[in-house]
Amino acid sequence: AENLKVTHYRNGDAIPTGYSNEAWSNLDDTTTGAYAVYNDNESYADTYGYLYNWYAVDDERGIAPEGWHIASDEEWMELEMALGMSESEANSTGYRGTDQGSQLAGNTDLWYNGDLENNSAFGTSGFNGLPGGYRSSSGNYYDVSYTSYFWSSTVYSVTFAWNRVLDYNYSDVFRNNYYPKSYGFSLRCVRD
């Protein structure tokens, strides 16, 4: 399993990219879908895929390949529960579960050493979550080697959407709805 690396919507239209920090931060005003390469360095994309704002996830042209869709918040919870998280924990926010974050992570060479990697369940699910970091609404890049940020397809409000975070120093999974849609996160697809 790997993070999404598409540069076009399903209909063939190019997904905009190459935005300066200021231009990236202005995408919130137009709700324009876009993607970025961590630190504008294409070699990162080979390993971590691209970082997409949530507007690209929500675009009616479809960002997932034919026969696939971006995982919803509910599908993330189903996955977490299949890995042993209780339903009540899955429905809560913040860090939840026990070792589900470690199960979802993969590739010890890429992660900064911490509780995520040191847990015996590390990498056992096949999900292979990699620490690709994120692009903030200001356009700056953060946390490669330390975190995996994933958008779900589930909206929370005009400004926010549901997401997941794997962090090098936690073996559980972070769920929240307070990152702005303008942030650039990794994406995972589920077969229709």
Please place each PLM-identified region on the residue numbering.
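Conserved positions within compact, well-structured domain cores
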Residues: 1-192
